Amino acid sequence: MTIRYDDLSVSWLGYATVRIEHEDFIAYLDPGRYGTLTGDWDGETAHPPGTDYDARDGDLVCITHDHHYDSDAIARVASDDATIVLYDAVDPARIDRDVDGIEDLPGEVVRIGAHEEYVVEGVGIETLPAYNRPDGPNTSGGEPIHPEGFGCGYLLDIGGSRVFWPGDSDVLDAHYELAVSLFLPSISSSFTMDRHGAADLAESLDPDLVVPIHYNTFEALEADSAAFAADVAGRGVPVILDERSS
């Protein structure tokens, strides 16, 4: 499903993949993994269907961290002259999956650090903190699953709208300081903020629209999206679910 918001067309394509179109400019966030863009994802949950996606139309592709680095998916969404924005800490050499190196990606690769800004064809890109707190629920063996510095979130300024994808992160104090038009929170049951934290943040940010992503792709990401939508709507914040019915 494509959601029309202001001058944007927004589609959740599964897992953390989002396509954002404004006029002749197309951006993708964290494309791929788990068969969502190869047609191999065949889950029965409330989630976009897996498709053999090969548009190669993206002007901008943004990757938050190693867990969302999928070189095949980047090639499927990026045009030949795309700008591929990779967070500095992304390192294919330490990824225990079959991925190509950065030198084999299409287009121009730009490495971007924490709290940095970049502009591609008039679209502003800002990195934001994204991590799990050591004393929070998303730890393994006493260590955060996503330690500070491992990944980032992105705030895109596109067509006058400010689109916020927090990445794989708990709700952080820095998030509450943002001016956001379109909020794309994870609402999964592990690894990131859950639906309750995401709803609290949505109420505080008071965006024009909330579209949750990064849930129901596999068992550990299961979430009650209908309950999230009811919670957010009950707080007076517009929300849309971009998913196939279970």
Identify what each model region corresponds to:
Residues N138-A202:
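Active-site-proximal loop/helix segments of hydrolase catalytic cores
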Residues I102-V119, Y176, A199, E203-S246:
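Binuclear metal-ion centers of metallo-dependent hydrolases, dominated by the metallo-beta-lactamase
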Residues M1-Y28, G32-L37, D42, E203, ...:
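Zn-dependent metallo-beta-lactamase
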Residues T2-S9, E21-A27, E117-E126, D157-V163:
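Beta-strand-turn-beta hairpins that frame and shape the catalytic cleft
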Residues L29-P31, D57-H67, V85-D88, F164-G167, ...:
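Active-site neighborhood of phospho(di)ester-bond hydrolases with catalytic His/Asp-centered motifs
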Residues I3, T17-C62, D66, S71-A75, ...:
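Pre-active-site segment of Zn-dependent metallo-hydrolases
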Residues Y15, G35-T36, D66-D72, D91-I95, ...:
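Active-site environment of divalent metal-dependent phosphoester hydrolases
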Residues H47-Y118, V123-P134:
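Active-site HxH/HxHxD metal-binding segment of metal-dependent hydrolases
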